[in-house]
Structure formats: C-alpha cells, structure tokens
C-alpha cells in the first residue's frame, strides 16, 4: 500500500505525506540507515524520540545475516527488530556491485562470493523481491545495476537498459508474490541527461509506486550531482514520491528538496558521529580537536537533543579521545536529531511558502562556523 499526496509547494520544494502499511510519513523525510536491522548506536526508542519516521534496512546484509529463515520466523523485519514504523529496504544491488572483484554479472543476475564465508551466491530480480517480501518492508526497491561515478555513454546506456529489463522482472515477481507493500523503480543513466530520461520513461511504462534516483553520490564531482538533480526535476512525475538514494550532507538535503526530492537516506550522520564529526546549524564540529578540551558549551546551544541538553563539548571531547562508546552514542543522537530537525524546518518553510528564504538563511548559518 502507498498513497502519496503533495499538500503544498514552495518553488520546486514539495510538502507531502506518504501513507504506508506501518504508518504515515511526513515529507520531505530523512531515513536513518539500519544496515543490519539496527541504526548504529541507537535503540528504537531513541530513534522514536528524535523523530525518525522511517528507517532503511539493507537487503543484502540481512539476507546473509541473520538470514531469511530467522526473520521469517518472527513474521518480518519489524517484529524482529522491534520497530513499528515504516521500513524501506534496498534491493541488495549496490552491495553486490561493490564486490567487483568477487562477482560475475549476466542477464539473469549476479553470481558472487559471500564476503562472510566465501560461499557462492546468486542474486536476481526475483530473488531480491522474494527477500524483501519476507522482510515485509513498507517500501521495496527494484534490483538494478549500479555504474561507477563516471563511465562512457555506451557503457551507461547498456547498464541502464539491463536495469530496465530487471525493473520489469522485479515488477512481475513483486506482483506474483502478492506483496502488499510499495515498489519503487530506480532511475539510472550516470551523468547523461538523455540516458536518465530514457531510464525514467522505461520505468514509467513498467509502473512503480515511487521513483528513486540512483547512481549519484558515487564519486562524481558535487557540481555534477547538483546539475543532474536540477535537470531531473522537471522530468520526474509530479504524482509520485522522489527518493534520492545515499545522499548526503545537510547542504545536499537542502539542494535536493529545492529540486523536488521527497526522501533521502545516508550513513553520513551516523558514520561521521562515530568518527567525531558532528553537524550543527552553525557548521561542523570535529570534537577531537584540542580547542574543545575545556569548552563548557554544548555542541549547539539552540539544539534540544539529549546530548546538547546535558553535556559539554569538553565531555564529548574527552569521551572521543579515550574511545568511550558513550561518546559515539551521544554524537549519533545529536547528528540524527539535527538531520530530523533540518527536515522539520524544511517542511515548515514549505508550508509557509518561504523555502527560498529558508535556504538562504540555512547557507548563511552554516557558513558562520561554530564558535
């Protein structure tokens, strides 16, 4: 089930709702990444407290561990991990294609060695749909082929055409399995506008509940990613949710929303938090820096997260320097809260038709740098 409604626009930005089997999501939305069924360093209660509406699970990794049999015994991923809100699962394609020296790609699918024990495994559109049906994720992604950051036109076209054939197979398998959830197609085509259009037109013929933009933030220069988003803005169907996969920084989120993107996911706020890189409205904090060793201020005096309400930069600096796990947890709570707050602010700005003003204020604040 999926019902998507756009309630308000401001320039190219859209404010909507996404009704799914496990609840309604307010868009634009950021999805924390829970690779193995867990958002690193966060409990489901903490995710709920910071305002997370939907999380992402990784089909490839959950297939390998704990395996479908275990998840199926629990009745699906929601029950297994104790999360009652929506979940999106990727198709497993990106992880498989990252194993470039351990895989063989054919029209049927991809044969590869398990990175865990070396077993020979095979992933096809049909198998990906079966896995995601067992997981019972609210949003299922088609299996596609991912190209590196920059390839020639012919290579990109050959790849996207196979992805379109796999899109048709994903759609058929999804329907044959009588999966009651939503299925998204993925636009590929590298950095070539004509190929992106070809991909999108093919997906529209197949018929999907939402459209994802894949193959960006994979090593291409940032201006090229922004150019492609701008060019895609007017091509994407207005009545379907637009999902930018694997992106990104706070600036990327604002730029994406300005270009009609409704959904994002990225490991950046959690991964950076564990490495002591913290995002705030005033710029980024590298908490390991000696300048913070006796700083009594919170990370952001205007932030309402648990870390900022209770702890100083000096304490977070200390925790990071001695390698205490609490430091990684507090940094993660803050970063994810900041990302959720940024999305809340963008939703409010769109509702009040002042998104462009918000965008200018956001850039000015982030440029000021942390005091």
Curated annotation (Swiss-Prot):
Cofactor detail note: Binds 1 zinc ion per subunit.
Residues binding Zn(2+), per UniProt: 303, 305, 308, 334
InterPro entries xrefs: ArchSynthase1/Queuine_TRR, TGT, TGT-like_sf, tRNA_ribo_trans-like
KW Metal-binding (keyword) present: yes
EC identifiers of the protein: 2.4.2.29
Known pathway: tRNA modification; tRNA-queuosine biosynthesis
Cofactor: Zn(2+)
One function term, GO molecular function aspect: metal ion binding
Catalytic reaction annotation: 7-aminomethyl-7-carbaguanine + guanosine(34) in tRNA = 7-aminomethyl-7-carbaguanosine(34) in tRNA + guanine
Enzyme class: transferase
Protein name: Queuine tRNA-ribosyltransferase
Designated gene of the protein: tgt
């Amino acid at each position: 089930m999926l019902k998507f409604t756009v309630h308000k626009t401001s320039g190219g930005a859209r404010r909507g709702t996404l009704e799914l089997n496990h609840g309604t999501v307010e868009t634009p939305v950021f999805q924390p990444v829970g690779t193995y069924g867990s958002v690193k360093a966060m409990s489901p209660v903490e995710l709920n407290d910071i305002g997370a509406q939907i999380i992402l699970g990784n089909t490839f990794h959950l297939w390998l561990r704990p395996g479908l049999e275990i998840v199926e015994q629990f009745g699906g991923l929601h029950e297994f991990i104790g999360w009652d809100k929506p979940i999106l699962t990727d198709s497993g394609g990106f992880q498989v294609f990252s194993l470039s020296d351990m895989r063989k790609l054919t029209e049927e699918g991809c044969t590869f060695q398990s990175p865990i024990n070396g077993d020979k495994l095979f992933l096809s559109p049909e198998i990906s749909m079966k896995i995601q049906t067992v997981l019972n994720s609210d949003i299922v992604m088609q299996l596609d082929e991912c190209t590196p950051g920059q390839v020639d036109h012919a290579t990109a076209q050959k790849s996207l055409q196979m992805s379109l054939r796999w899109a048709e197979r994903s759609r058929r398998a999804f329907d044959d399995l009588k999966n009651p959830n939503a299925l998204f197609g993925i636009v590929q085509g590298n950095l070539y506008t004509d190929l992106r259009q070809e991909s999108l037109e093919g997906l529209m013929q197949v018929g999907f509940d939402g459209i994802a933009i894949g193959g960006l933030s994979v090593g291409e220069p940032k201006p090229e990613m922004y150019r492609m988003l701008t060019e895609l803005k007017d091509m994407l169907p207005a009545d379907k949710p637009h999902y930018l996969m694997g992106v990104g920084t706070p600036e990327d989120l604002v730029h994406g929303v300005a270009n009609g993107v409704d959904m994002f996911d990225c490991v950046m706020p959690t991964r950076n938090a564990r490495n002591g890189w913290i995002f705030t409205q005033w710029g980024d904090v590298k908490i390991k820096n000696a300048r913070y060793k006796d700083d009594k201020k919170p990370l952001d005096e205007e932030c309402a997260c648990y870390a900022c309400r209770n702890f100083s930069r000096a304490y977070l600096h200390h925790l990071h320097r001695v390698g205490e796990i609490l430091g990684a947890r507090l940094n993660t709570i803050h970063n994810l809260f900041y990302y959720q707050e940024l999305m809340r602010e963008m939703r409010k700005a769109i509702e009040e038709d002042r998104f462009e003003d918000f965008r200018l204020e956001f850039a000015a604040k982030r440029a000021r740098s942390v005091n």
